[in-house]
């Protein structure tokens, strides 16, 4: 792909200008799977740029959209969080080489995107585990939580980052990375060590480093209150923090871990407070809250953000019982040597060049994880198993033979600790082991590492009963809940500044940016079995241990021009406006579209399965409708496509207002019924006055969106819904009555007398004030008072869609991931600190 480097010179402005836009057109005309991956990585750092690009050109770039979803955003492999993290790290390694091949595809300077970072300077408690689930990597701050430790990725500042990827040694310009490690066990340190440059790795053998990173901070009262009740011998807890002997033990353990190549490291002495075992069920432990102050601000200065670990502990305890019997997942490389300080990127090159590497493998439920040793590179292959969990209860001898499984809190009291000697083996599930605490051996760049990890949900990967190769020595293992309360766990870990290694792209920080607010047209899954085919949708479309909801893994195929060959719909030519979908944690306003013609062309197998035994989370097709006030958010003219109007919608969420951006398609396809809400802006400015809001209701399938406006007061509606959780069902009932009573008049010729407004009077971005009284507009609100605060505009549906409230055809050509994007962005813009409470959800759902 040839590019003109003249587009990317030092004369660039700090914002997206027309030169870059022309370059994007060049990229668009030469799209290929490799270049789309590169564009995807670019979007992880500059999401607004890619959103702008896709808004203009996405109609004929389905390969890009498909690649974004398949490669990294919505299909992390099953398993614990660090398994997914390794997946993304491998992806970033692959992307780094593409940077080297196409250096001038990226501008040398781009300003920071305040839109994605402005709300995070506020002090608010963030639960690390919840943060990871809600918006992984979307915020310049990625918090990865395991059962026993938290690792914080914090770019040093949010100042504009200069990009010049003309060669691999320029990757260091990405910026400095600050690791804040909370030493709950040794795993956080191992993790940082694996991804640290050589000069930082040497610190492991520096006594001054240990003096700094292990410092007693907890008070006597705090420690005495935090001693768990289930610990066998609480006297081993030191009162005044870790002793010198503890520090030496930790140093000895870590150093031997990073230098040993056999399983003898399991016998290494560990800090006494880290070797406690449970004599009761782990869920009986006292849950303590350990708050960690992390420093991050927009301008790079420091401000306090309290991260509460209590919820993470509760999540662990809440799922230990139900995850009994799940197994460890082992990633082992043939190269069993410890990470070397001078590791090169040789294996990473193999990872990029090898077709059947991490990125082409997606874990599906009920599949065997087979690790081959044909190459130094760990290669994952998936084979469908019988789909049932092993019923035979593992005895102690079987459990002791299990490879790479810590089984913290297992019933026999002792758990094996070892590292696989051979990389081709099938891991055996063990009864009585909590999946949250499995050790996973990760294949780094020519190295191997084991971690204590946790998964939010119990993994559903069942494996055949087969003998494991290694027979590790049983040894006491870390206890996540116990170490959570030990004195050393509450110590301030200190800051370890890690600089990116010039020649090792694996040192890039995981910046997993979700691409938000994209207008995507993707087909919904067809009938099929997720257990028989590897589906990139399976992570989100299958739920629970024995999900019976059936989905196909068949993916849409595209011709070179980019039009969809597999989809029977016409959506690739005329994309629908995607609606933020109603999820269990939010109720949103949405732009809705139904295509009657496309609905008629759908095959029966492609219609959503309404009667599935288990309705997958985030894939419901029911749309609840709420009116909200809307405000125009003006952006520079060169960043907004002319056929889109960017808005920020304010919605009711647990008594608070939250914002999310969405796009309105200005001109709908003929035959498409659109219900859209636009904004009347009496004045210009960054935020126009929300005093008046106008709502569009089209009168015929080919009517313009601006044909009908109804003026009303939105604030009363918000207040009513916020204070009365039972309002909405009655609103829907009234709406149904109004729909039936006005069905004839909606389609009658008299409808043509509705006052219409010429399109010429409308700005492509901001509507001028245009108001009509409800009585003039339509008989739609005939049974409603014009000033009623509970008035709900009716939506026109294709007949037969479940009394008009089912909008199946909207999502017949849509996949749920985009809908979740709106949700993630919504959570991100509101700090992600509050989930929807059942109090207001019950009345609305």
From Swiss-Prot:
| Biased amino acid composition, Polar residues | 224-241, 400-422, 674-683, 691-701, 743-760
Report the subcellular localization: Mitochondrion
Q: Which residues carry this modification: Phosphoserine?
A: 567
Highest taxon of source:
Eukaryota
Q: Which GO cellular component terms are attached?
A: mitochondrion
The segments labelled Disordered in the record are 224-244, 324-346, 383-434, 456-485, 519-619, 674-701, 739-785
Bias (Basic and acidic residues) occurs at: 390-399, 534-546, 579-588, 600-614
Q: Where is the composition biased (Low complexity)?
A: 563-576
The alphabetized UniProt keywords are: Mitochondrion, Phosphoprotein
Primary residence = mitochondrion
Task: Spell out the protein name for this chain.
Answer: Uncharacterized protein C428.10
Q: What is the lineage of its organism?
A: Eukaryota, Fungi, Dikarya, Ascomycota, Taphrinomycotina
């Amino acid at each position: 792909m040839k590019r003109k480097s003249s587009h990317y010179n030092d004369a660039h402005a700090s914002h997206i200008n027309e030169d870059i836009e022309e370059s994007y057109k060049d990229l668009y005309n030469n799209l290929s799977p490799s270049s789309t991956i590169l564009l995807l990585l670019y979007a992880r750092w500059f999401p607004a740029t890619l959103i702008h690009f896709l808004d203009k050109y996405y109609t004929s770039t389905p390969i890009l959209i498909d690649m974004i979803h398949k490669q990294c955003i919505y299909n992390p492999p099953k398993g614990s969080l660090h398994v997914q993290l390794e997946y993304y790290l491998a992806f970033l390694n692959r992307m780094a080489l593409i940077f080297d091949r196409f250096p001038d595809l990226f501008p040398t300077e781009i300003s920071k995107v305040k839109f994605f970072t402005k709300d995070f300077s506020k002090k608010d408690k963030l639960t690390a585990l919840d943060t990871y689930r809600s918006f992984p990597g979307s915020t310049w701050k990625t918090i990865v939580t395991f059962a026993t430790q938290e690792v914080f990725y914090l770019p040093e500042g949010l100042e504009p980052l200069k990009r010049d990827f003309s060669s691999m040694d320029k990757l260091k310009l990405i910026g400095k990375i600050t690791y804040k490690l909370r030493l709950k066990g040794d795993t956080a340190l191992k993790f940082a060590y694996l991804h640290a440059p050589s000069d930082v790795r040497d610190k492991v053998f520096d006594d001054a480093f240990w003096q700094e990173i292990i410092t007693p901070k907890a008070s006597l009262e705090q420690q005495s209150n935090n001693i768990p009740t289930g610990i066998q011998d609480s006297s081993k807890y030191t009162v005044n923090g870790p002793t010198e002997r503890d520090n030496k033990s930790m140093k000895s353990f870590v150093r031997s871990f990073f230098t040993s190549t056999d399983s003898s490291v399991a016998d290494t002495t560990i800090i006494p407070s880290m070797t406690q075992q449970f004599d009761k069920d782990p869920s009986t432990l006292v849950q303590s809250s350990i708050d960690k102050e992390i420093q991050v601000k927009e301008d790079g200065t420091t401000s306090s953000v309290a991260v509460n670990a209590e919820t993470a502990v509760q999540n662990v305890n809440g799922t230990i019982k139900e995850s009994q019997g799940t197994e460890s997942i082992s990633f082992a490389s043939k190269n069993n040597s410890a990470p070397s300080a001078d590791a090169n990127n040789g294996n990473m090159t193999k990872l990029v060049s090898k077709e059947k590497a991490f990125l082409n493998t997606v874990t599906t439920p009920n599949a065997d994880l087979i690790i081959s040793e044909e190459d130094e590179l760990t290669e994952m292959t998936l084979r469908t198993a019988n789909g049932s969990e092993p019923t035979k209860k593992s005895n102690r001898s079987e459990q002791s033979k299990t490879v790479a499984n810590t089984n913290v809190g297992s019933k026999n009291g002792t758990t094996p600790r070892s590292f696989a000697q051979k990389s081709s083996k099938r891991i055996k599930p063990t009864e009585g082991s909590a999946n949250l605490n499995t050790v996973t051996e990760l294949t780094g760049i020519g190295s191997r590492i084991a971690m204590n990890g946790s998964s939010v949900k119990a993994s559903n990967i069942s494996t055949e009963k087969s003998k494991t190769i290694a027979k590790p020595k049983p040894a006491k293992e870390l206890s996540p809940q116990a170490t959570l309360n030990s004195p050393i766990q509450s110590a301030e870990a200190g800051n370890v500044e890690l600089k990116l290694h010039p020649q090792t792209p694996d040192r890039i920080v995981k910046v997993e940016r979700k691409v938000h607010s994209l207008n995507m047209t993707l087909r919904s899954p067809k009938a099929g079995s997720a257990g028989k085919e590897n589906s990139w949708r399976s992570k989100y479309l299958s739920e629970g241990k024995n999900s019976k909801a059936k989905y196909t893994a068949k993916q849409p195929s595209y011709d070179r021009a980019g039009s969809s060959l597999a989809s029977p719909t016409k959506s690739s030519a005329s994309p629908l406006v995607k609606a933020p979908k109603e999820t269990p944690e939010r109720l949103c306003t949405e732009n809705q579209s139904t295509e009657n013609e496309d609905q008629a062309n759908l095959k029966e197998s492609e219609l959503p399965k309404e009667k599935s035994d288990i309705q997958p989370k985030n894939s419901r097709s029911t749309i609840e409708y709420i009116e909200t006030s809307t405000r125009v958010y003006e952006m520079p003219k060169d960043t907004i496509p002319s056929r889109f109007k960017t808005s920020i919608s304010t919605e009711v969420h647990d008594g608070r207002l939250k914002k999310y951006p969405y796009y309105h398609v200005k001109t709908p396809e003929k035959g498409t019924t659109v219900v859209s809400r636009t904004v009347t802006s009496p004045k210009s400015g960054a935020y126009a006055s929300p005093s008046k809001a106008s709502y569009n209701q089209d009168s015929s399938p080919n009517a313009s969106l601006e044909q009908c406006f109804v003026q009303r007061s939105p604030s009363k509606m918000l207040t009513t819904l916020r204070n009365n959780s039972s309002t909405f069902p009655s609103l829907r009932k009234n709406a149904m009555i109004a729909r039936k009573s006005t069905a004839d008049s909606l389609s009658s010729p008299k409808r043509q007398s509705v006052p219409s407004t010429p399109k010429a009077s409308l700005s492509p971005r901001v509507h001028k004030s245009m108001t009509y009284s409800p009585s003039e507009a339509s008989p739609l609100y005939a049974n409603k008072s014009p000033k009623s605060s509970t008035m709900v505009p009716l939506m026109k549906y294709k007949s037969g869609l479940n009394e008009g409230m089912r909008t199946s055809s909207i999502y017949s050509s849509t996949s749920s991931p985009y809908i979740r994007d709106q949700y993630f962005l919504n959570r991100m813009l509101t700090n992600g600190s509050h989930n929807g409470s059942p109090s207001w959800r019950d009345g609305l759902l």
